[in-house]
Amino acid sequence: MTIKNFTFFSPNSTEFPVGSNNDGKLYMMLTGMDYRTIRRKDWSSPLNTALNVQYTNTSIIAGGRYFELLNETVALKGDSVNYIHANIDLTQTANPVSLSAETANNSNGVDINNGSGVLKVCFDIVTTSGTGVTSTKPIVQTSTLDSISVNDMTVSGSIDVPVQTLTVEAGNGLQLQLTKKNNDLVIVRFFGSVSNIQKGWNMSGTWVDRPFRPAAVQSLVGHFAGRDTSFHIDINPNGSITWWGANIDKTPIATRGNGSYFIK
């Protein structure tokens, strides 16, 4: 076997033995792209004239292939949501890239660097009335990476993380509603009415499921509804729950409150 297609070694000192397919894969690897995502930069703003959009000076990378739209006009459908696609067909050697306005996002994820076919990638959503453009929404530019390490980060939008929920019948009337954000933070809501419990007892009900268990003991404080008194519980690494409030007899006392802890 032979390792080929170096980008760092030129046997003739005049050119790299790398083809366009290899170059396309390099772009995608460096930016965390897949075949349904794009990179786009408008060097000047597109112009909307009646039922047309003109890309005056826009750079796009799709499928690892870089191209420029210079005064490229797309005809739009009236009273519609127009999904603007870049279509890359490498068999059309004279004009391998075309633009189309379609009625849905028809991005198809075709791997043009390792196989064949026409790659379609949506990069703009343009809404029209009967006479002109009413709104434009560029497709979000997405990267998929295994890990990121940064010194500083500023976020102007939202951060979406996986969310799991769990209700625990802790026993003795106490109930916990757990909401886990990512694999880091658990938010706990106390509810239910507690009875027949003494300080230091392990509660008699269900233990916390393994995915919600902390690495170290976590102490959470709640309060008794309508009273000026509080209590706390320990959630232990094995999932058991220990009561550290006052001793309570058979008369139930309603609980309320919220707490949180980090799993790790």
Curated annotation (Swiss-Prot):
Localization, UniProt: Virion
Segments of this protein annotated with the region Host receptor binding: 164-264
Family stated for the protein in its record: Belongs to the skunalikevirus receptor binding protein family.
Subunit structure: Homotrimer; found as an assembly of 6 homotrimers. Interacts with host phosphopolysaccharides; this allows the virus to bind the external cell wall layer. Interacts with the distal tail protein.
CDD domains membership: RBP-H (cd07964)
InterPro entries: Adenovirus_pIV-like_att (IPR008982), Caudo_bapla_N (IPR048780), Caudo_bapla_RBP (IPR015027), Caudo_bapla_RBP_neck (IPR048779)
Matches recorded under Pfam families: Caudo_bapla_N (PF20747), Caudo_bapla_RBP (PF08931), Caudo_bapla_RBP_neck (PF21564)
Any one cellular-component term (Gene Ontology): virus tail, baseplate
Origin species: Lactococcus phage p2 (Lactococcus lactis bacteriophage p2)
Keywords: Host-virus interaction, Viral attachment to host cell, Viral attachment to host entry receptor, Viral baseplate protein, Viral tail protein, Virion, Virus entry into host cell
GO biological process terms, semicolon-separated: cell adhesion; entry receptor-mediated virion attachment to host cell; symbiont entry into host cell; virion attachment to host cell
Keyword Protease: no
Upper classification of the organism: Viruses, Duplodnaviria, Heunggongvirae, Uroviricota, Caudoviricetes
Segments passing through the bilayer: none
Function: Binds to the host phosphopolysaccharides at the onset of infection. Upon activation by calcium, the receptor binding proteins change their conformation, presenting their binding sites to the host, and a channel opens at the bottom of the baseplate for DNA ejection.
Free-text comment about domains: The C-terminus is involved in host receptor binding. Host-recognition domains point upwards, towards the capsid.
Protein name as it appears in the record: Receptor binding protein
Main location (coarse class): virion
Gene expressing this chain: rbp
